[in-house]
């Protein structure tokens, strides 16, 4: 299982999301750790050969996103967590 490495305030930002959104994104990150991909996760285009993945979750209060990379063999770097305005 790959370890998560949180960049900047990404972990704190995720903790501010609604509980249901946190749970679903947490499940998506777990799947990534296991080498799989959540059905709401998709690669971001336009970044060359970088393997950057975005998980999107919606609820009544908006759309929430977490961006991570799976480039490293032992780690998943969670780059950013934010609410789309």
Predicted segments with their positions:
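Catalytic DNA-binding helix-loop module of base-excision-repair DNA glycosylases/AP lyases
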Residues: 69
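Conserved catalytic cores of phosphodiester-cleaving nucleases, focusing on short active-site segments
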Residues: 79
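Short beta-to-alpha linker loops that shape the active-site pocket of alpha/beta-hydrolase fold enzymes
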Residues: 82
């Amino acid at each position: 299982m790959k370890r998560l490495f949180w960049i900047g305030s990404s972990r704190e930002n995720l903790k501010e999301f609604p509980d249901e959104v946190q749970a679903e994104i947490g499940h998506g990150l777990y799947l990534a750790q296991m080498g799989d991909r959540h059905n709401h996760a998709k690669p971001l285009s336009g970044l060359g050969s970088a393997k950057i993945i975005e998980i999107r979750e919606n609820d009544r209060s908006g759309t929430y996103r977490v961006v991570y990379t799976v480039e490293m063999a032992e780690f998943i770097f969670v780059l950013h967590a934010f609410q789309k305005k």
